């Protein structure tokens, strides 16, 4: 028994050795920056012209200023609105395509090709997508030219000067970039469902809609929860598309300014105290959402 125990210890030693590179990278690039961010959030540290103010310890003053300032609530509303405008069509489209291409009864050909094509937008850089949409929807772009030629409008419509259309473009771009990833996840979940359940439902005379709502959707619950929460976390971190499309201004009338763009403004102006406080708030929100995912998926496993 002692010899066997010694062998187990020796084998486990290699597991710990292989973990060392990950631990080192995590400490350098994750843990130390996190501690530094929390530390800086309690200090007044910014540039006033060419003069460096601080660092001076101010306690929770940065957090109080952050929440007393009305800007954070405006940008939180913008961030959540952009996420909702993107996620609702994204999840509907992904569910429809996933159910369509994973349905054994339809026996559609070319599903492998479809899986590749639908994921391609996810590989395109946000900067390239933004420049493409900026060109397409500019005043002299092809979309305005086409609408004027068919007589739908008389003068070029300023898509980026209207809050609704600007938000719509950002939501559309994010939907196109990420719906492929969601579709693949849902398709994998649907294809993992036991086909005998569908066969039994067919024998009982269930319609396609009844099968989808009563069998497919309930069994997809863990994956749907994962998709919703990860999408929400991604929505909180929305930055690249509106930053490039509006050149960091969040126009028109700050309607496309997100929380991460707000954070970037503080970092660009070297207001490290406020940037640290905002980062900590976002970190706490992300941590709470991650805990929700863990609890829900854990409950599903225990029920299973």
Language model: regions and residue ranges:
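N-terminal leader/signal peptides at the extreme start of proteins
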Residues: 1-4
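A structural signal for multi-pass alpha-helical bundles of membrane permease subunits
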Residues: 7-304
């Amino acid at each position: 028994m002692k010899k066997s125990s010694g062998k187990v210890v020796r084998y486990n030693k290699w597991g710990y050795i292989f973990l060392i590179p990950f631990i080192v990278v995590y400490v350098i690039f994750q843990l130390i920056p996190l501690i530094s961010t929390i530390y800086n959030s309690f200090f007044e540290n910014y540039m006033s012209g060419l003069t460096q103010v601080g660092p001076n310890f101010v306690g929770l003053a940065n957090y109080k200023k952050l929440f007393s300032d009305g800007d954070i609530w405006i940008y939180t509303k913008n961030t959540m609105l952009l996420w909702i405008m993107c996620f609702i069509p994204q999840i509907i489209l992904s569910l429809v395509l996933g159910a369509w291409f994973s349905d054994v009864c339809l026996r559609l050909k070319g599903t492998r090709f479809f899986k590749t094509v639908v994921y391609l937008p996810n590989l395109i850089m946000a900067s390239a997508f933004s420049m493409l949409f900026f060109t397409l929807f500019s005043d002299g772009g092809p979309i305005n030219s086409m609408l004027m030629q068919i007589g739908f409008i008389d003068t070029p419509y300023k898509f980026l000067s209207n809050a609704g259309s600007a938000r719509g473009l950002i939501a559309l771009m994010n939907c196109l970039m990420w719906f492929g990833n969601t579709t693949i996840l849902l398709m994998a979940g649907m294809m993992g469902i036991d086909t005998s359940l569908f066969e039994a439902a067919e024998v009982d005379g269930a319609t396609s809609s009844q099968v989808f709502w009563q069998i497919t959707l309930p069994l997809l619950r863990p994956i749907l929860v994962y998709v919703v929460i990860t999408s929400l976390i991604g929505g909180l971190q929305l930055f690249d598309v509106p930053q490039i499309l509006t050149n960091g201004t969040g126009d028109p009338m700050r309607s496309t300014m997100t929380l991460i763009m707000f954070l970037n403004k503080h970092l660009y102006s070297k207001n490290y105290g406020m940037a640290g406080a905002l980062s900590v708030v976002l970190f706490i929100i992300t941590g709470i959402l991650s805990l929700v995912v863990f609890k829900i998926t854990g409950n599903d496993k225990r029920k299973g």
